[in-house]
Amino acid sequence: MTDILDDMIARADVAELFNLPMEYLGARVVKHDYKTKYPVKYLGNKNEDYPRKNWSSVVLWNCGYSPNRILTREKVAESTGSWLHRFSWLKDDQIGDLPSEWNHLTMEYEPRDDAKLYHYTVGTPCFPEYRVQEASDLWYATYRRAVSPIDTGC
């Protein structure tokens, strides 16, 4: 099996998010507030807790929001990953909520059938130690569709 490293599968149309009001917000995210159950994740990487953890994994940006104008190419290039991932230039009230079903963290949270986006943040089922987990069947089905020949009907 070829490893695929994508760790999210959307089960709904992300266009739904564009209907959310953004006028006074710099971004909308799922505001995860948790301590990881897994101090080590895929490939032996550290999985540390930090403020606003996993907030940056699904973001609806307001590109016209004036505080976001600080994000020039140069600023992004010189900034640390933690500064960027924590939205350090935005105050809490400048970051709105996305419904939690839009960034469901498998293995970290209790399973849910209404998840619109599964995020295999600890490890995708392509890694042996994560083969059996919530929604692994969905991951494998998506993988098979992605690597199978396209049926053009010709």
Locations of regions flagged by a protein language model:
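Short, P/G- and charge-enriched loop/turn segments at secondary-structure junctions
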Residues: 43-48
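A glycosyltransferase accessory/donor-loop signature
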Residues: 55-154
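Generic detector of bulky aromatic hydrophobic side chains
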Residues: 5-8, 50, 139
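Membrane-cytosol interface at the C-terminal ends of transmembrane alpha helices
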Residues: 39-41
